[in-house]
Amino acid sequence: MTILLVTRSFVTGEAMSESEKSLYDSKENVLKELLLTYGIDSTETQRRQLLKHIELLIEINKNLNLTRITSIDDALVLHILDSLLPLKVCNEFTSGAQNYIDIGTGGGFPGLPLAIMSDNKTLLVDSIGKKINAVQSMIDEIGLGERVRAEKLRAEEIPNDYKQKFDFVTFRAVAKTNILLEYAEPFLAPQGTLIVMKANVDEIELQDASQAAKIFGYENVSRETFELPHDLGHREILLYRKVGKSKIKLPRKTGMAKSNPFVARRD
């Protein structure tokens, strides 16, 4: 018996055996307690949907490389908890139905878990079409298609109707922070928030990010650190608010942000 069968039958409402229900309940309780340990409240429906995401991810991953994490217990920490840590530092994220984009979403992280835990109208983008097709299928299976969708898109290729549209932008371990500040700026509405999720941030990266923030019209709101359970890693979340206009026209040509990034002067 596997958790895949358990969550599928539970979410779709099909009848489960007692052993199946017991196994599902154990994972749902583990997730509930895990989130509560970090001060994150969740409903039973949200936990069902979060588990459904992991179920679908593991199943699709058999044929398409979306993640190296194939253990349900590790996925609860490294995918679900990790994705939801921004809720600890950005209360505004769940304050109403807002526009949110997750860039470089991969297997739907952190965007899909954050969409599950909020009422935000959510767009998940990635440059790889196969990943986007998989993520859209997961969105539909979970039942969030009315307000969440996936689209193939590069960070530097911004349709006009996406410019200055989003209240929140997230990146999870995609690139250095100064580069992410540049990528996000054209998407963000005035006073919008960029949420950067990293494993480790050194002093040089922070200095470069500070310089880029001045150029692109941001203020640094906060830097918070977390330790994942079971020694599964250190996490940092940086929040930036768009408070002014960029001093240069963005986006630059494709590839320029990485090949010629804005950095702090080195003495």
Model-derived regions: residue spans:
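N-terminal amphipathic/basic-hydrophobic helices that include classical n-h-c signal peptides
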Residues: M1-A15
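Class I SAM-dependent transferase core
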Residues: S17-E20, K27-S95, S137-L144
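Residue-level signal for inorganic ion chemistry
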Residues: L57, L114, K198, Y240
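Conserved SAM/SAH cofactor-binding pocket of Class I
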Residues: L84-A175, L181-A184
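Short strand-turn motif at the edge of the Rossmann-like AdoMet-binding core
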Residues: V174, M197-V201
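Helix-to-beta-strand junctions that scaffold the AdoMet/dcAdoMet cofactor pocket
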Residues: L188-P190
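Short, charged/polar "capping" segments at the starts of alpha-helices
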Residues: D202-L206
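SAM/dcSAM-binding transferase cores
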Residues: Q207-D267
